[in-house]
Amino acid sequence: MTCTILVGGQWGDEGKGKCITYFCTQDKPEIIARAGVGPNAGHSVEFNGEKYGLRLTPSGFFNKEARLLIGAGVLVNPEVFEHELEYLSKYAVEGRTFMDANCAIITDKHTKQDKDSAYLSKKIGTTGSGCGPANADRINRTIDYAKDVPELEKYITDVPSEINKAIDEGKDVFIEGSQGFGLSLYYGTYPYVTSKDTCASTAAADVGVGPTKVDEVIVIFKSYITRVGEGPFPTEISPEEAEKMGIEEYGVVTGRKRRVGLFDKDFAKRSCMINGATQIALTCIDRLYPECAKVNKYEDLSQEARDYIEDIEENVGVPITIISTGPDLADTIDLRNEKLN
């Protein structure tokens, strides 16, 4: 039984939703915990032919046996939280979705400040979700916590106690981060970053898990890179080149068109170093090599695709254990047994 953390290795939009869905289907963790900044990041999840866009609820919600927890490090907008409970009602998330008492609360004041700031909205490219101003208030110790909001009382639990008890009992725990390494307040392309760190160590702290309790850190990369908003992007290609490659993507929260670039092995190596990666999940290989769409055996990938994957693995120095070849759960090559045992 393991405690696993999954975080993004680039600038977000790496395909965390699909991979989390896969892990939570295959491994069936008893607890799925949400770490990260807050509702400024969207996870796209496809399950049973339906697509969901989530901003707070853990992406493994479809596993009806799992408890879904939101760690104290995560900012909560009660309106977004309530909306997602209703939105996902067919999966019986009510009664098994809880947040820590110390989650800080985003209010209309914070979202207004975010949207009204020309610096944040135009220069930095904020999503307008209120996370930056809310984290500023948190640092100044002027923000309300979930325990201060009567309407949230029935959703409050002691997240660190629940998770650590589960780990001590030998149960599987899955912790999902949000956004990506390049957006880290500490290690990203400052000032074009989010309002806190996005690395695996912070994800563990967000939910109250000490570093010695973590068994696996999976860093997820897209086979190419995308970025929403402003900021340095060394391997960026022109929209015309991206169009020739057949790549056109839009952000889940903002709807803004994503910038596109080539895979950056040096950036990936640094991302894996700082995150302490034990595994890599690589997504969207089918976008670069369309002949690999829906392949679920490594030997059935084209030689060109295999060479591409093996070159990344050799240069980054971390085993690539999961390869996504399409949006469906079946479109996955799982090499964990071969590479980790």
From Swiss-Prot:
Cellular compartments annotated: Cytoplasm
Binding sites annotated in the UniProt record for substrate: 252-258
EC number: 6.3.4.4
Catalytic activity entry: IMP + L-aspartate + GTP = N(6)-(1,2-dicarboxyethyl)-AMP + GDP + phosphate + 2 H(+)
Annotated catalytic residues: 13, 43
Binding site for Mg(2+): 13, 42
Top EC class, one word: ligase
GO cellular component: cytoplasm
PROSITE patterns reported for this sequence: ADENYLOSUCCIN_SYN_1
CDD domains with a match to the protein in the record: AdSS (cd03108)
Keyword annotations: Cytoplasm, GTP-binding, Ligase, Magnesium, Metal-binding, Nucleotide-binding, Purine biosynthesis
Pfam families per record: Adenylsucc_synt (PF00709)
Role description: Plays an important role in the de novo pathway of purine nucleotide biosynthesis. Catalyzes the first committed step in the biosynthesis of AMP from IMP.
Family annotation (HAMAP family): Adenylosucc_synth
Subunit structure: Homodimer.
Name the record gives this protein: Adenylosuccinate synthetase
Lineage of the organism: Archaea, Methanobacteriati, Methanobacteriota, Methanomada group, Methanobacteria
